[in-house]
Amino acid sequence: MEIQVVGMERLDDFMGLMETTGQRDGFNIRPKSYFERMLDSLGEKVRLYMAFYEGQPISGAITTNFGGKTCYVYGASDNAHRNVMPNYLIQWEMIRWAIETSCWVYDFQGVSGILEESHHMYGLYRFKRGFNGTLDELAGEFDYIYQPLKAKMVDQAIALNGAMRTVKRKLQHKN
């Protein structure tokens, strides 16, 4: 397995991994244009890491580095070759970058907040917790709703989409 710091030339590979991860874990992903803007605007303060196994991209992650803090902001992996655990090696390389740039904090960012093994996002918590960090609970996000009817419709559409992804994921696992 090989880990590389790559640029825009590998963004399509990363997006494919994001789509696979989103389908597997039941979450929506941001559009490619979002990641293009992130990589373009943050310059030297952002890195896209990719893991390759037998020449194929099997995992990717985006990390930012600013003000003494390195943040793991996005990660994705293929369904194939999960047994070689590329996400751990990518994390190690990102932690090395944090050390090289004299960061004093490596932030894995958030987890769902529901820390029950039965929750579908528990694996993300287990992965991050495996690095022996601490879980810091912050205030979170606040939204001001200025068009309640439209907001309710969007919330219902998102919930329906999530439910459909869950059903699809369960059907795929049965086959």
Please place each PLM-identified region on the residue numbering.
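A conserved beta-strand-loop-helix scaffold within acyl/acetyltransferase catalytic domains
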Residues: M1-N83
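A generic structural-conservation signal
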Residues: V5, P31, D107, E137-L138
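Secondary-structure transition/hinge residues
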Residues: G22, G26, I99-S102, D136
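Solvent-exposed, flexible loop/coil residues
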Residues: P31-S33, F52, M85-Y88, E93, ...
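A short, terminal or domain-edge coil/loop segment
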Residues: E54-N65, N83-P86, T101-W104, Q156-L171
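Acyl-donor binding region in acyl/amide transferases
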Residues: N65-G133
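Active-site/acyl-donor-binding loops of N-acyltransferases
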Residues: F108-N175
